[in-house]
Amino acid sequence: RYIPYDQEDVKRQMVAAIGIEDKNTVTRANYYTLDLXIDTVTPDVNRNELKEK
């Protein structure tokens, strides 16, 4: 099912939750993981790339 999230608000919450400063790394796919209640919203590859910056 589709839930019309307030995308900017969702981005802010996810950025705070997973400690990513660049909100642009939050993708549409991540919105669906929120609805599924999955805590891990960022693939390990992206997480490693962010650590290197």
UniProtKB/Swiss-Prot annotation:
What does the entry list under GO cellular component? extracellular region
- Which top EC class is given? hydrolase
What domain of life does the native source organism fall in? Answer: Eukaryota
Name the protein family.
Belongs to the venom metalloproteinase (M12B) family. P-III subfamily. P-IIIb sub-subfamily.
Share what the entry says about its subunit structure, partners included. Answer: Monomer.
Where does the entry say this protein is expressed, by tissue? Answer: Expressed by the venom gland.
Is Hydrolase given among the entry's keywords? yes
Localization, UniProt: Secreted
Give the originating organism. Answer: Trimeresurus albolabris
Question: What is the name listed in the Swiss-Prot or TrEMBL entry for this protein?
Answer: Zinc metalloproteinase-disintegrin-like alborhagin
